[in-house]
């Protein structure tokens, strides 16, 4: 699976449920800010409950898909569009949709909330560090 980042968005990171049992080593818990939406996001696309998702604050990324038939979902209170075959559609949160090679998703902004989530069926191919996919920006 390959995704081209056109715009990174604000505070866009990969997150899961976080890491536990490492704080005594100085490694913070980290993890998604909204665990409920993280779990819903993974459930809607058929992923494991602790698979990584893309978490974003206020403005999300703009991404170009580089593979056919990818099932996606955006959760939270989010304004987003997706472009399929040069036509732009308004997205609906908590509803899955398929994207194909060269289709784009533009996560414009969150509405009355800080965070939103995006994931794909099958998850992202990432390497775990300290038993988690979560990003801790201050580390």
Region roles according to the model:
Residues 1-139:
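Conserved "landmark" site that anchors the functional core of diverse proteins
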């Amino acid at each position: 699976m390959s995704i081209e980042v056109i715009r990174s968005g604000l505070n866009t990171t990969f997150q899961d449920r976080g890491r536990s049992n490492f704080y005594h080593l100085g490694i913070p818990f980290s993890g998604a800010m909204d665990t409920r939406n993280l779990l819903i996001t993974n459930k809607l696309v058929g992923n494991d409950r602790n698979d990584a998702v893309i978490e974003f604050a206020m403005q999300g990324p703009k991404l170009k898909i580089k593979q056919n038939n990818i099932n996606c979902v955006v959760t939270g209170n989010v304004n987003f569009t997706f472009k399929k075959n040069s036509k732009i559609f308004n997205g609906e949160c908590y509803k899955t949709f398929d994207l194909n090679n060269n289709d784009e998703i533009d996560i414009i902004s969150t509405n009355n909330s800080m965070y939103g989530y995006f994931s794909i069926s099958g998850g992202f191919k990432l390497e775990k560090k300290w038993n988690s996919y979560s990003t801790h920006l201050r580390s």
